[in-house]
Amino acid sequence: MEKAKPNYFPALDGLRLLASINIVMLHLGSSSALAYMSDYKWIMPIVNAPAFAAGIFYVLAGFLFASKFSDPERQIPVIPFMFARISKLYRLHFFMTILMFLVLVFKFSGYTHLPGFSEIGDCFAAGLAKMTHPWRSLFLHITLTWSIVPDLGMKLNEPSWSLTSFFVCYAVTPWFSRWLFKQSNRTLWVLFGTLFIPGILWAAFFGLSDNLWFDSYDAKYRFFHIFAPVRIFEYLFGMVLFRLYKEGFFDFLKRDYVGGISQFVMLAAIYGSLFLMRPELNPGINYFFHHSLPILLYGLFLISLLPGKGGVARFFCIGIVRKIGRASFYPYLIHLPIITIAWGICNLNCPKNTILLMIFIYTVSTLYSEFKVWRRKKAKAKLQENSAK
């Protein structure tokens, strides 16, 4: 029996890179490292909104996992699958959380120089005394529970909240991927629309409620933004997109020029959506413009890239872009501690230092990713060698 050819979409590696860079630039901006760009009114919304927010990672992951588990007969043990996926990123999350904790202890200590050996104890005690629930915060981040109760602790390595919601997504992946194969095309299109309902209701609740039990609007927004059960529907939307793609509903994108035109239109729509949010609108409406609407646009942009045609898709398929893109979730986890440390070394608010920092983050991440690939190939070759004896 001939083995089925696996689904592979090279341009999506470049999409990962684009989304990752946008998130890193967002946090550079929030740390005041991009103040020199403040006069560029047509660029800053891309960074500050951002144009490609965390939701794109969920749509992309849902699509890719649906493609990997496209065999309806494949049985996937849920618990091993969940922990296998999380373990690939948790080790890095753990070390970055510890690093960020130590960096914040030093920052809050008031020391302006690296403490000598005899000063370490005093520096540590002074920093802890000025932090809010430091040990509880560390525990919440290490156990991936901070995103559930973010108001109970400080934010350490904040982007790690996504690991919690991905853990929930992975829990339903085996079941939902098998269930999708049993559904008719009509049901798939119904799902295409109805999966947005929870996010819209969440936006309405956000806009119609007061600050609830939160101390401030910002604390409330952070909770609504990282709430894992809502993020799962973005992931499922990505899975539904793959099934619709496999059923041939997007084959028209394979025609000459159609893919390129579609990519241009979707990028223009994503950019235009950034200007829909306005201070005078109800917060729930702005939340919808920032969370629900982009998910649809991200999904359609993703679909337009799949045939590999068009200028954007061809750029995303360049070897070096794909190589860096495959490692792009590592910058997502490591950039905040590195930005915090960099501010203690130099002034990040200048173009040269911004570029150098980005080069450092993505070089380290790519080398780490390539090392893991090399180690995996080496272990596989050794296993094959031993089995051949």
Features from the language model and the residues they span:
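Membrane-interface micro-motifs in multi-pass membrane enzymes
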Residues: 11, 51-52, 158-166, 224-239, ...
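Membrane-cytosol interface segments of multi-pass membrane proteins
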Residues: 1-211, 311, 327-328, 345-389
